[in-house]
């Protein structure tokens, strides 16, 4: 692994950047000082001196940005390419400790068409997904990806001017597991904080006897009988335990085509580390272990290996 090379590149980049900043600050200060002295000698007005100084400062800063881009573009490209290579090696290293039949693609994820086709959630106006992982844990097949969804919003001020901006409505992980019961109809169980509530008329809003669960979750079912077949009292307790353990902004359990989908809206990207810092391999591996632990915990806590009800 090229961690030593990566850290050396980061150190060199930081030194060059600091040196350029200091030199630039000195040059800008000298130029501005000379300009002010010349304007004072010409007996220019205070307004002209201030305006000229501001314009010169903006121009000089723009020149500095251009110089930085020109000088450091190759360095940043080399660092980023090495970052991607090391990240893939670290992720695969940790995955292989726990799973079999592993595939990992950091640039691809669950496609927008898949999310739409399966009716998992609204994909908003801007959709992206990466860090696709699939594998087997205790004979249970799974896959997961990071997903980011943004929706276009408009804001009107008092004068009627409209400003368009994009708001992140989902940023987190989407996981898919083989489920240990067979069913024909879809079922959605989600915490009240989960966004993207887009359902057709075929869903009905139902409640169960567990008041605490009803207060924390919304349940939408296509078939009430199948919903209660899946949501046994013991399974409900497992869902409550998972929800408390994850503590995200929202969580969705979606039962679809004999699969269990779990969306976790926690404003986080799994398996990432700061590309602007030197790599601490042990620390990064520990963080990745935590990200991977979630997959194992969900399979274990929800008892997905129990195939008693499989037909």
Ranges and model annotations:
Residues 1-20:
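Cytosolic juxtamembrane N-terminal segments of multi-pass membrane proteins
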Residues 1-7, 80-98:
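Juxtamembrane membrane-interface segments of multi-pass membrane proteins
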Residues 20, 62-90:
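Transmembrane-cytosolic junction motif
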Residues 21-41, 56-60:
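Canonical alpha-helical transmembrane segments of integral membrane proteins
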Residues 40-51:
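Membrane-helix interface and helix-disruption motif detector
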Residues 50-67:
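Hydrophobic alpha-helical transmembrane segments of integral membrane proteins
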Residues 92, 96-101, 105-155, 161-311:
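Charged, low-complexity intrinsically disordered regions
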């Amino acid at each position: 692994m090229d961690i030593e090379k990566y850290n050396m590149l980061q150190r060199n980049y930081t030194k060059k950047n600091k040196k350029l900043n200091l030199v630039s600050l000195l040059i800008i200060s000298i130029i501005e000082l000379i300009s002010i002295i010349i304007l004072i000698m010409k007996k220019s007005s205070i307004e002209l001196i201030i305006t000229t100084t501001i314009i010169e400062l903006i121009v000089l800063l723009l020149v500095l940005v251009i110089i930085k881009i020109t000088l450091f573009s190759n360095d940043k490209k080399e660092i980023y390419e090495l970052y991607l290579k090391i990240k893939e090696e670290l992720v695969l290293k940790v995955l292989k400790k726990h799973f079999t039949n592993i595939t990992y693609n950091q640039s691809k994820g669950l496609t927008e068409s898949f999310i739409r086709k399966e009716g998992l959630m609204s994909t908003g106006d801007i959709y992206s997904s990466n860090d696709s992982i699939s594998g087997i844990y205790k004979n249970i097949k799974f896959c997961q990806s990071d997903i980011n969804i943004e929706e276009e919003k408009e804001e009107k001020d008092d004068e009627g001017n409209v400003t368009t901006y994009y708001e992140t409505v989902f940023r987190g992980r989407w996981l898919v597991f083989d489920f240990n019961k067979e069913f024909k109809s879809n079922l959605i169980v989600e915490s009240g904080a989960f966004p993207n509530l887009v359902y057709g008329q075929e869903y009905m809003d139902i409640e169960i006897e567990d008041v605490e669960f009803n207060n924390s979750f919304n349940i939408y079912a296509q078939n009430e009988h199948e919903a209660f077949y899946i949501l046994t009292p013991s399974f409900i307790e497992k869902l409550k335990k998972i929800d408390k353990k994850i503590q995200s902004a929202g969580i969705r359990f979606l039962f679809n085509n004999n699969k269990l989908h779990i969306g976790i809206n926690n404003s986080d990207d799994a398996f990432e580390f700061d590309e602007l810092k030197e790599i601490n391999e042990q620390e990064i591996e520990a963080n990745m272990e935590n990200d991977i632990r979630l997959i194992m915990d969900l399979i274990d806590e929800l008892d997905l290996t129990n195939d008693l009800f499989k037909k």
